[in-house]
Amino acid sequence: MTIAAAPPSSRFRAVRIWLTLVAALIAVMVLVGGATRLTESGLSIVEWKPVTGSLPPLTDTQWHAAFDGYKQIPQYRELNAGMTLDQFKTIFWWEWSHRLLGRVIGIVYLLPFLWFLWRGAIGPEWKRALWIIFALGALQGAVGWWMVASGLSQRTEVSQVRLATHLSLALIIYAAIVWTLRRMADGARVAAPVRLRVTALALLGLTFVQLYAGALVAGLRAGRLYNTWPEIDGALIPDAARLWFESPWWKNLFDNHLTVQFDHRMLAYALWTLAALHMIDALRTRAAARGAVQLFLALTAQATLGIFTVLYAAPIDLALVHQAMALVVLTLAVLQAERLTATRKDRTARDRGAAGRLAIPSEPFPSA
C-alpha cells in the first residue's frame, strides 16, 4: 500500500538521463570485464598509462613492443609460450576495450556533472553523493591496476581476492547510481512493516556478499570443477577435512576451490529462501509486492543459470549470461530496498535540490 505521493516533477529528468547512461555503461563494462577474464586476456597489457594508454599500438613496431612486454610475465612463459602475434592481438583487444570503457565512463560522468553543477541543477543533498560516486570511480581505476599488478611477477593469473574487490567496487558504484536514480524519481512512499524493510535491506546486503563470492569462484576458475548438482564433491555437504585443509582456516574462504564454490552455493540457497519469504510477506501486506515478485523471479532464473553453468563447467557464453543476470538481480534488489526504506523526507529532498530549467520529457528509470 502507498500513503503519500510526491508531486510530479521534471526537474531531475536531465540528470536522471545522464545517470542512466552512466549506469548502462558500467553494466557494459562489467560484462566486457567478464569476457576479458574468461578469455584470459586481463594480463595482455603490462603497463598502466591512464592518459597515453588510450591509444592502441598503431604500427608493427608498437605491436611487437607490446608483445615483448607480455612475453616477460609468467603467464606467457608458463601458459602461452609460442603464442603468435595475431593470437596476442586477440587478447590485447579485450583488455584494451575494457580499459577504454573505463576512460569513457570517467568522461561521460565528469563532464556532464560539472555542467550540471555550473547550471545549478544539482542541490547540496545530491552534490555530496555524486562527488562520492566520482571519487569511487577514480579509486576503481587504481584498484584495477592493483589487480592486474598481482599477475605480473609471480602468478600466472590475477589474485582472485583483488579481482573480487575490483568487481565489487564496480557494483557498489553501479548500485549507488541506481539508488540515486530511484530516489530522484517521482513515486509514492510505501507504507510497510519494519520487518519487510529489514528483509529488503538484508536481501541487498546478501546480494553483495553473493556477488563477491561469485567473483572468487570466477577468479579461481572454480566453476570448472565439481560439475555436479545438487551434490558437490560427491556429497550435499563435503567432508570438513576437504573444506578446511588450508591453514589458517580462513584462507579456505578465499583460496580453497571446493570451499569457495560450496560457499557460493550455500549463499545462493540462503538468498533464494530469503527472497521467497520477503515475497510472501510483501504479497500478504500488499507493500511493494510487485518489486518483491520481480526480485524472486530474477533470483530463481539466476539460480537456474548458476546450476547450468556448473553442470557445463562454466562455458564462456553461459558464464557471461550468468554474470549479466547478476546485474539484473542487483538492480532489482537496490530498487526494492530503496522503495521500502525511503521516507517522506527523502522523497521531498529532491525538490529542494533541483533547478527547473533542465527539464527533458523522458522517464529513463522505473519510478515504482
From Swiss-Prot:
<comment type="pathway">
    <text>Porphyrin-containing compound metabolism; heme A biosynthesis; heme A from heme O: step 1/1.</text>
</comment>
<comment type="subunit">
    <text>Interacts with CtaB.</text>
</comment>
<dbReference type="GO" id="GO:0005886">
    <property type="term" value="C:plasma membrane"/>
</dbReference>
<dbReference type="GO" id="GO:0046872">
    <property type="term" value="F:metal ion binding"/>
</dbReference>
<feature type="transmembrane region" description="Helical">
    <location>
        <begin position="266"/>
        <end position="283"/>
    </location>
</feature>
<keyword id="KW-0350">Heme biosynthesis</keyword>
<keyword id="KW-1133">Transmembrane helix</keyword>
<keyword id="KW-0408">Iron</keyword>
<dbReference type="InterPro" id="IPR023754">
    <property type="entry name" value="HemeA_Synthase_type2"/>
</dbReference>
<feature type="transmembrane region" description="Helical">
    <location>
        <begin position="104"/>
        <end position="124"/>
    </location>
</feature>
<dbReference type="GO" id="GO:0016653">
    <property type="term" value="F:oxidoreductase activity, acting on NAD(P)H, heme protein as acceptor"/>
</dbReference>
<feature type="transmembrane region" description="Helical">
    <location>
        <begin position="200"/>
        <end position="220"/>
    </location>
</feature>
<dbReference type="InterPro" id="IPR003780">
    <property type="entry name" value="COX15/CtaA_fam"/>
</dbReference>
<dbReference type="Pfam" id="PF02628">
    <property type="entry name" value="COX15-CtaA"/>
</dbReference>
<feature type="transmembrane region" description="Helical">
    <location>
        <begin position="161"/>
        <end position="181"/>
    </location>
</feature>
<feature type="transmembrane region" description="Helical">
    <location>
        <begin position="296"/>
        <end position="316"/>
    </location>
</feature>
<keyword id="KW-0560">Oxidoreductase</keyword>
<keyword id="KW-1003">Cell membrane</keyword>
<keyword id="KW-0479">Metal-binding</keyword>
<feature type="transmembrane region" description="Helical">
    <location>
        <begin position="14"/>
        <end position="34"/>
    </location>
</feature>
<keyword id="KW-0472">Membrane</keyword>
<feature type="binding site" description="axial binding residue">
    <location>
        <position position="264"/>
    </location>
    <ligand>
        <name>heme</name>
    </ligand>
</feature>
<comment type="function">
    <text>Catalyzes the conversion of heme O to heme A by two successive hydroxylations of the methyl group at C8. The first hydroxylation forms heme I, the second hydroxylation results in an unstable dihydroxymethyl group, which spontaneously dehydrates, resulting in the formyl group of heme A.</text>
</comment>
<feature type="transmembrane region" description="Helical">
    <location>
        <begin position="318"/>
        <end position="338"/>
    </location>
</feature>
<feature type="transmembrane region" description="Helical">
    <location>
        <begin position="129"/>
        <end position="149"/>
    </location>
</feature>
<protein>
    <recommendedName>
        <fullName>Heme A synthase</fullName>
        <ecNumber>1.17.99.9</ecNumber>
    </recommendedName>
</protein>
<keyword id="KW-0812">Transmembrane</keyword>
<comment type="similarity">
    <text>Belongs to the COX15/CtaA family. Type 2 subfamily.</text>
</comment>
<dbReference type="GO" id="GO:0006784">
    <property type="term" value="P:heme A biosynthetic process"/>
</dbReference>
<feature type="binding site" description="axial binding residue">
    <location>
        <position position="322"/>
    </location>
    <ligand>
        <name>heme</name>
    </ligand>
</feature>
